[in-house]
Protein backbone atom coordinates (compact mmCIF):
# COMPACT_ATOMS: atom_id res chain seq x y z
CA UNK A 1 0.00 0.00 0.00
CA UNK A 2 1.13 3.58 -0.67
CA UNK A 3 -0.24 6.83 0.72
CA UNK A 4 0.67 10.05 -1.09
CA UNK A 5 0.85 13.14 1.13
CA UNK A 6 0.18 16.63 -0.09
CA UNK A 7 2.30 19.68 0.81
CA UNK A 8 2.99 19.74 4.55
CA UNK A 9 5.04 21.86 6.94
CA UNK A 10 8.04 20.93 9.08
CA UNK A 11 9.28 23.18 11.90
CA UNK A 12 12.56 22.90 13.84
CA UNK A 13 12.93 25.25 16.80
CA UNK A 14 16.09 27.05 17.91
CA UNK A 15 18.22 26.34 14.85
CA UNK A 16 19.63 29.87 14.73
CA UNK A 17 21.28 29.72 18.17
CA UNK A 18 22.19 26.02 18.25
CA UNK A 19 25.65 24.98 19.51
CA UNK A 20 27.25 21.58 20.10
CA UNK A 21 25.22 19.86 22.80
CA UNK A 22 22.02 21.83 22.09
CA UNK A 23 18.76 19.87 22.05
CA UNK A 24 16.30 20.90 19.33
CA UNK A 25 12.63 20.03 18.90
CA UNK A 26 10.94 19.50 15.54
CA UNK A 27 7.35 19.06 14.32
CA UNK A 28 5.70 17.96 11.06
CA UNK A 29 2.10 17.85 9.82
CA UNK A 30 0.49 17.02 6.47
CA UNK A 31 -2.44 15.22 4.83
CA UNK A 32 -2.90 12.25 2.47
CA UNK A 33 -4.08 12.94 -1.09
CA UNK A 34 -4.20 9.44 -2.63
CA UNK A 35 -3.90 5.70 -1.89
CA UNK A 36 -2.43 3.10 -4.27
CA UNK A 37 -2.11 -0.68 -3.98
CA UNK A 38 0.40 -2.62 -6.14
CA UNK A 39 1.00 0.65 -8.03
CA UNK A 40 -2.71 0.88 -8.92
CA UNK A 41 -4.76 3.79 -7.61
CA UNK A 42 -7.40 2.80 -5.07
CA UNK A 43 -10.75 4.45 -5.70
CA UNK A 44 -11.53 6.61 -2.68
CA UNK A 45 -14.35 8.97 -3.66
CA UNK A 46 -14.91 10.02 -0.04
CA UNK A 47 -11.27 10.97 0.66
CA UNK A 48 -11.35 14.72 1.27
CA UNK A 49 -8.07 16.56 0.61
CA UNK A 50 -9.35 20.14 0.97
CA UNK A 51 -9.56 20.29 4.77
CA UNK A 52 -11.18 23.39 6.24
CA UNK A 53 -11.63 24.82 2.72
CA UNK A 54 -14.20 22.11 1.95
CA UNK A 55 -17.75 21.52 3.15
CA UNK A 56 -16.47 18.86 5.55
CA UNK A 57 -17.89 15.86 3.68
CA UNK A 58 -16.19 12.45 3.56
CA UNK A 59 -13.03 11.80 5.59
CA UNK A 60 -9.39 12.91 5.66
CA UNK A 61 -6.10 11.21 6.55
CA UNK A 62 -3.55 13.41 8.31
CA UNK A 63 0.02 12.95 9.53
CA UNK A 64 1.48 14.45 12.72
CA UNK A 65 5.00 13.86 14.03
CA UNK A 66 7.47 15.30 16.52
CA UNK A 67 11.13 14.59 17.19
CA UNK A 68 14.04 15.72 19.38
CA UNK A 69 17.65 15.97 18.25
CA UNK A 70 20.99 16.80 19.90
CA UNK A 71 23.61 18.77 17.96
CA UNK A 72 26.85 16.76 18.02
CA UNK A 73 29.12 18.84 15.74
CA UNK A 74 29.20 22.16 13.87
CA UNK A 75 31.72 22.72 11.08
CA UNK A 76 31.18 25.85 9.00
CA UNK A 77 27.77 25.55 7.40
CA UNK A 78 27.28 21.91 8.40
CA UNK A 79 25.65 20.71 11.61
CA UNK A 80 25.56 17.06 12.70
CA UNK A 81 22.97 15.75 15.14
CA UNK A 82 21.61 12.59 16.72
CA UNK A 83 17.91 11.81 17.13
CA UNK A 84 16.92 11.14 20.73
CA UNK A 85 13.14 10.71 20.68
CA UNK A 86 9.78 11.56 19.16
CA UNK A 87 6.43 10.25 17.95
CA UNK A 88 4.66 9.58 14.61
CA UNK A 89 0.88 9.30 14.06
CA UNK A 90 -1.45 8.77 11.12
CA UNK A 91 -5.01 9.97 11.81
CA UNK A 92 -8.37 9.13 10.23
CA UNK A 93 -10.71 12.11 10.65
CA UNK A 94 -14.38 11.74 9.68
CA UNK A 95 -14.92 15.51 9.81
CA UNK A 96 -12.34 17.01 7.39
CA UNK A 97 -11.08 20.35 8.69
CA UNK A 98 -7.27 20.53 8.60
CA UNK A 99 -5.79 24.02 8.27
CA UNK A 100 -2.11 24.97 8.00
CA UNK A 101 -2.86 28.64 8.64
CA UNK A 102 -5.01 27.80 11.65
CA UNK A 103 -2.62 25.04 12.79
CA UNK A 104 -5.60 22.82 13.45
CA UNK A 105 -7.40 19.64 12.38
CA UNK A 106 -4.33 17.40 12.01
CA UNK A 107 -4.81 15.33 15.18
CA UNK A 108 -8.60 14.93 15.27
CA UNK A 109 -10.35 11.61 15.96
CA UNK A 110 -8.24 8.52 16.56
CA UNK A 111 -4.74 7.63 15.38
CA UNK A 112 -4.79 4.55 13.12
CA UNK A 113 -0.98 4.10 13.24
CA UNK A 114 1.35 5.20 16.06
CA UNK A 115 5.11 4.91 16.40
CA UNK A 116 7.84 6.00 18.85
CA UNK A 117 11.12 7.47 17.61
CA UNK A 118 13.88 5.47 19.33
CA UNK A 119 17.08 6.82 17.73
CA UNK A 120 18.92 7.94 14.62
CA UNK A 121 21.04 10.83 13.37
CA UNK A 122 21.94 13.06 10.44
CA UNK A 123 23.22 16.46 9.31
CA UNK A 124 22.16 19.74 7.72
CA UNK A 125 24.39 21.89 5.48
CA UNK A 126 23.79 25.48 4.37
CA UNK A 127 25.40 27.12 1.32
CA UNK A 128 24.93 30.70 0.00
CA UNK A 129 22.18 29.73 -2.45
CA UNK A 130 20.86 26.36 -1.25
CA UNK A 131 20.80 23.94 1.67
CA UNK A 132 20.47 20.19 2.11
CA UNK A 133 20.41 17.70 4.96
CA UNK A 134 19.39 14.27 6.07
CA UNK A 135 18.60 12.07 9.06
CA UNK A 136 18.14 8.38 9.78
CA UNK A 137 15.50 7.91 12.48
CA UNK A 138 14.57 4.53 13.96
CA UNK A 139 10.89 4.14 14.86
CA UNK A 140 9.16 1.41 16.84
CA UNK A 141 5.52 0.90 15.79
CA UNK A 142 3.45 0.90 18.99
CA UNK A 143 -0.09 0.39 17.75
CA UNK A 144 -2.31 0.33 14.67
CA UNK A 145 -5.96 -0.10 13.77
CA UNK A 146 -6.44 -3.72 12.57
CA UNK A 147 -9.60 -2.64 10.74
CA UNK A 148 -7.43 -0.41 8.53
CA UNK A 149 -4.10 -2.27 8.25
CA UNK A 150 -3.43 -5.96 7.77
CA UNK A 151 -1.92 -7.36 11.01
CA UNK A 152 0.66 -9.39 9.03
CA UNK A 153 1.83 -6.27 7.21
CA UNK A 154 2.18 -4.28 10.42
CA UNK A 155 3.99 -7.12 12.20
CA UNK A 156 6.74 -7.66 9.63
CA UNK A 157 6.39 -5.14 6.83
CA UNK A 158 8.62 -2.38 5.49
CA UNK A 159 7.22 1.17 5.47
CA UNK A 160 8.83 3.84 3.31
CA UNK A 161 7.91 7.52 3.59
CA UNK A 162 9.45 9.75 0.91
CA UNK A 163 9.48 13.49 1.49
CA UNK A 164 10.32 16.35 -0.89
CA UNK A 165 11.40 19.51 0.91
CA UNK A 166 10.96 22.98 -0.62
CA UNK A 167 11.98 25.46 2.14
CA UNK A 168 11.72 28.56 -0.07
CA UNK A 169 8.01 28.16 -0.85
CA UNK A 170 7.16 31.60 0.57
CA UNK A 171 3.56 31.66 -0.69
CA UNK A 172 2.63 28.42 1.09
CA UNK A 173 4.38 29.41 4.32
CA UNK A 174 3.07 32.98 4.40
CA UNK A 175 0.05 32.07 6.53
CA UNK A 176 1.79 29.54 8.78
CA UNK A 177 2.73 30.84 12.24
CA UNK A 178 2.88 27.56 14.20
CA UNK A 179 3.02 23.78 13.74
CA UNK A 180 1.21 21.41 16.13
CA UNK A 181 0.78 24.30 18.56
CA UNK A 182 4.43 25.41 18.51
CA UNK A 183 5.00 29.02 17.34
CA UNK A 184 7.46 29.78 14.53
CA UNK A 185 10.02 32.57 15.00
CA UNK A 186 11.75 33.51 11.75
CA UNK A 187 14.95 34.74 13.43
CA UNK A 188 15.66 31.46 15.21
CA UNK A 189 13.63 28.60 13.71
CA UNK A 190 13.56 26.63 10.45
CA UNK A 191 10.19 26.25 8.66
CA UNK A 192 9.96 24.27 5.40
CA UNK A 193 7.33 22.91 3.02
CA UNK A 194 7.41 19.14 2.44
CA UNK A 195 5.63 16.64 0.16
CA UNK A 196 5.72 12.92 0.87
CA UNK A 197 4.23 9.45 0.53
CA UNK A 198 4.05 6.40 2.79
CA UNK A 199 4.66 2.91 1.34
CA UNK A 200 3.74 -0.26 3.26
CA UNK A 201 5.33 -3.55 2.14
CA UNK A 202 4.97 -7.10 3.49
CA UNK A 203 8.76 -7.54 3.84
CA UNK A 204 10.47 -8.39 7.17
CA UNK A 205 12.71 -5.35 7.58
CA UNK A 206 13.38 -2.96 10.52
CA UNK A 207 11.55 0.36 10.45
CA UNK A 208 13.68 3.47 10.27
CA UNK A 209 13.02 6.93 8.94
CA UNK A 210 15.56 8.52 6.59
CA UNK A 211 15.30 12.23 5.87
CA UNK A 212 17.45 13.64 3.07
CA UNK A 213 16.40 17.15 2.10
CA UNK A 214 17.56 19.98 -0.17
CA UNK A 215 16.03 23.16 -1.50
CA UNK A 216 13.52 21.56 -3.83
CA UNK A 217 14.26 17.89 -3.18
CA UNK A 218 14.52 15.45 -0.31
CA UNK A 219 13.86 11.94 0.88
CA UNK A 220 12.25 10.64 4.04
CA UNK A 221 12.26 6.88 4.43
CA UNK A 222 10.40 5.09 7.19
CA UNK A 223 11.32 1.50 8.06
CA UNK A 224 9.51 -0.25 10.83
CA UNK A 225 11.30 -1.97 13.73
CA UNK A 226 9.85 -5.40 14.23
CA UNK A 227 7.84 -5.49 17.43
Q: For each of these PLM feature ranges, what is it?
A:
Residues 1-202:
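Extracytosolic secretory-pathway proteins
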Residues 204-223:
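A short, hydrophobic C-terminal helix/tail in secreted or cell-surface proteins
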